[in-house]
Amino acid sequence: MRHTWRWFGPVDKVTVQDAAQAGAEGIVSALHHITTGDVWPVDEITKRHEAIKAGGLYWDVVESVPVSEDIKTQTGDWKNHIANWQETLRRLSASGIRTVCYNFMPVLDWTRTDLRWETRHGARAMRFDLTDFAAFDIHILKRPDAKADYPDWLLEEAAKRFAEMPDTKIAALGRNIGAGLPGSADGYTLAQLLEKLRSYHGINRGRLQQNLIDFLSEVTPVAEEVGINICAHGDDPPWPLLGLPRILSTEADYAHMLSQVDSRANGVTLCTGSLGARADNDLPFIAGRFADRIHFVHLRNVTRDTDTVPCSFFEDEHLEGGTDMVAVIAALITEEARRRAEGRDDHTIPMRPDHGQEILDDLTRGAQPGYPAIGRLKGLAELRGIERTLSHGRFGLATGKG
């Protein structure tokens, strides 16, 4: 695999040079300052390439070209936004980009209730607490009919939790849940979030699935034409939130998407942390089943409080948690060997250590939530060690790698 590192641009407190020192071979980045739905300007794409080269690395993967809410709901200026997405692919390809990640989560991107939860050894990790989330939905956001989405026991727990919740915790929940895309300055107030939720009235799971297929039917031919692999990131967490449907949460969801637009250019961002929040997602099996269409990998682990769906969980160390990371990496390097033997030019799959706990100096550095320097360095080193061991000519898998 090609070891990459997410960089949020010049505002990122973790530099490209830091990434290189951590062992990264390439950078994952995006133009977060460009308004969602607009075409990415050529000069801005060039500036990002140059900024990354100045740090000693190259821009390997775009994460993400955001998909607008207009496209997801097929309202407003959605057709023009699709045309702009297509043109952005053309411009990225002309600059040398070959992999573009995106997601189709409605309204909210990845959602956590606590961005700096203290672990058993004093590190800080991101956590999704189901009771806190229900308390937010019912008692803080006050979403109409929210109570119908939760079982009686959780309604009771959420009411009790909210009654004991200090004002600082109430404010923090609103900030954490209403945050926008990672790297983006955008976010929602409670009123704005309720308004966004209303825009999905009448859009059920089947309708949102079809809107995704309609989007892919338009952009995949352009991706094929310009030599880019587009890859869908899963829902995080992988179940409905705030009454909104989610459509990339399971093996079956991905199978549907890939079969409906059956092109190698239409592929998967395999995020083990996102899908791993569900106990019924067998990540090594999923990695093997969709291996031919995996274009980008996020390796992350979570520990669930229970095996129910939904559940509470936290982002554990990369080799801890519920996902067998050794088995996942074995499936990926086996696929790389198969592609190499087939002569595919995309035989090396870009991977990044997804998120990381705040440890050591991370605790005072103040990086983007989930993206500390030392926590990710540790994760990348551990993952690299597994890959090197499995790829060893004498002791590892027969990968055919020279």
From Swiss-Prot:
Its cofactor is Fe(2+); Mn(2+). Its EC number is 4.2.1.8. One of its GO terms (biological process) is D-glucuronate catabolic process. Pathway: Carbohydrate metabolism; pentose and glucuronate interconversion. It catalyses: D-mannonate = 2-dehydro-3-deoxy-D-gluconate + H2O. GO terms for molecular function: ferrous iron binding; manganese ion binding; mannonate dehydratase activity. Keywords: Iron, Lyase, Manganese. NCBIfam families: PRK03906.1, uxuA. PANTHER family: MANNONATE DEHYDRATASE. Belongs to the mannonate dehydratase family. Catalyzes the dehydration of D-mannonate. This is Mannonate dehydratase 1. It comes from Agrobacterium fabrum (strain C58 / ATCC 33970).
